[in-house]
Amino acid sequence: MKIGVYPGSFDPVTNGHLDIIERASKIFDKLIVAVLVNPNKTPVFDIEERVELLKETTEHLPNVEVKAFKGLLIDFMKQENAKVIVKGLRAVSDFEYEFQMALLNKKLEPSIETIFMMTNSKYSYLSSSMVKEVARFGGCIEDLVPEKIAKKVMKKLNKKYTEMEEK
């Protein structure tokens, strides 16, 4: 069985992420969307919320599983018996960092491969940070995040930014 892992913080999941997930799910027998607990970031959505949003977003894809993980990605890969990391690239600017990470993962575990997938050009500008920024200033995010979860994401972001402004 070919198992791929698509890691990220997904805070929140965007249409760009979904584009990569849908396309990668056609390549692998099983694709695990690995939601990272990143100690270097303070997420708006906690790990349970991010996992739940991704499960809702990907429920139409029977070979996709969503799991949380912390620690080294290669340790998670071993635990899941996966050999391929899937990384989405929006632009050339993403490549340098992702290339360095791929080389590091290869050094730590030589059996691990990384494949890079270019996002659809209509999402090349899109990031979770941009979704949060648009929401913060009251803009519409319905075309930026999966339709299924747009209202939940907007509600959470509105609440978060209202609380920040009150402080």
From Swiss-Prot:
Binding of ATP, residues: 9-10, 17, 88-90, 98, 123-129
Catalytic activity: (R)-4'-phosphopantetheine + ATP + H(+) = 3'-dephospho-CoA + diphosphate
Entry keyword set: ATP-binding, Coenzyme A biosynthesis, Cytoplasm, Magnesium, Nucleotide-binding, Nucleotidyltransferase, Transferase
Marked site (Transition state stabilizer) residue numbers: 17
Metabolic or biological pathway, per its Swiss-Prot or TrEMBL entry: Cofactor biosynthesis; coenzyme A biosynthesis; CoA from (R)-pantothenate: step 4/5
Coiled coil: none
Transmembrane segments: none
Enzyme class, broadest EC rank: transferase
Gene Ontology MF terms: ATP binding; pantetheine-phosphate adenylyltransferase activity
Cofactor entry: Mg(2+)
Keyword Nucleotidyltransferase assigned: yes
Taxonomy, superkingdom: Bacteria
CC per GO annotation: cytoplasm
Enzyme Commission number(s): 2.7.7.3
Family annotation (InterPro entries): Cyt_trans-like, PPAT, Rossmann-like_a/b/a_fold
Entry keyword annotation includes Nucleotidyltransferase: yes
An individual GO BP term: coenzyme A biosynthetic process
PANTHER family cross-referenced by the UniProt entry: PHOSPHOPANTETHEINE ADENYLYLTRANSFERASE
Family statement drawn from the similarity comment of this UniProt entry: Belongs to the bacterial CoaD family.
Reported function: Reversibly transfers an adenylyl group from ATP to 4'-phosphopantetheine, yielding dephospho-CoA (dPCoA) and pyrophosphate.
Protein name (database record): Phosphopantetheine adenylyltransferase
Natural source organism: Caldicellulosiruptor bescii (strain ATCC BAA-1888 / DSM 6725 / KCTC 15123 / Z-1320)
